[in-house]
UniProtKB/Swiss-Prot annotation:
InterPro entries: Chaperonin_GroES (IPR020818), Chaperonin_GroES_sf (IPR037124), Chaprnonin_Cpn10_CS (IPR018369), GroES-like_sf (IPR011032). Pfam families: Cpn10. Coiled coil: none annotated. It comes from Aeromonas salmonicida (strain A449). Belongs to the GroES chaperonin family. The gene is groES. PROSITE patterns: CHAPERONINS_CPN10. This is Co-chaperonin GroES. Together with the chaperonin GroEL, plays an essential role in assisting protein folding. The GroEL-GroES system forms a nano-cage that allows encapsulation of the non-native substrate proteins and provides a physical environment optimized to promote and accelerate protein folding. GroES binds to the apical surface of the GroEL ring, thereby capping the opening of the GroEL channel. SUPFAM superfamilies: GroES-like. Heptamer of 7 subunits arranged in a ring. Interacts with the chaperonin GroEL. The lineage of its organism: Bacteria, Pseudomonadati, Pseudomonadota, Gammaproteobacteria, Aeromonadales. The keyword Nuclease does not apply. Its main location: cytoplasm. One of its GO terms (cellular component) is cytoplasm.
Amino acid sequence: MKIRPLHDRVIIKRIEAEAKSAGGIVLTGTAAQKSTRGEVLAVGTGRILDNGDVKALAVKVGDKVIFNEGYGVKTEKLDGQDVLILSETDILAIVEA
């Protein structure tokens, strides 16, 4: 299935971090925190400004990002995997290699 976000929305696939404690113990269940890193799968056309102009998004498909998972972040199933739909303002940083 193909999904196309609207306006300033971004579709992200979470990149799961290995859940280990500082001592090397593998954490499971509620002890393991969800990763706030992901890969951008799709982006909208841009943010609509007050004057009607459209400002292109700073992120692009394939970018690795760090995001804030808070109010307004929606989880959906896409082809059997969980993806996140969020506003570009919920993205805190682009991870550059």
